[in-house]
């Protein structure tokens, strides 16, 4: 399942090897988005982009196109 498909308020762990192209992967790693870290989609901005997510203890805004590259495990 992709992070962009996750329902609001549901917490899942980021799946290994799920960050797409190297440039996207390095950007997400810099934000603390690593495999095994819990992630929750909290809300979305008007028109659906970006998404506000909790990654571990941090709150981030992630563009929906970047969230398409983040795979999450089926259950927490």
Task: Describe the residue ranges of each PLM region.
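Short, acidic/hydrophobic/Gly-rich beta-strand patch recurrent on exposed beta strands
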Residues: 14-16, 32, 52-54
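Short alpha-helix capping/helix-loop boundary micro-motifs
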Residues: 21-27
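C-terminal structural segments of small proteins and small subunits
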Residues: 3-4, 20-21, 45-76
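Short, conserved secondary-structure segments in the cores of folded domains
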Residues: 2, 27-30, 41-43
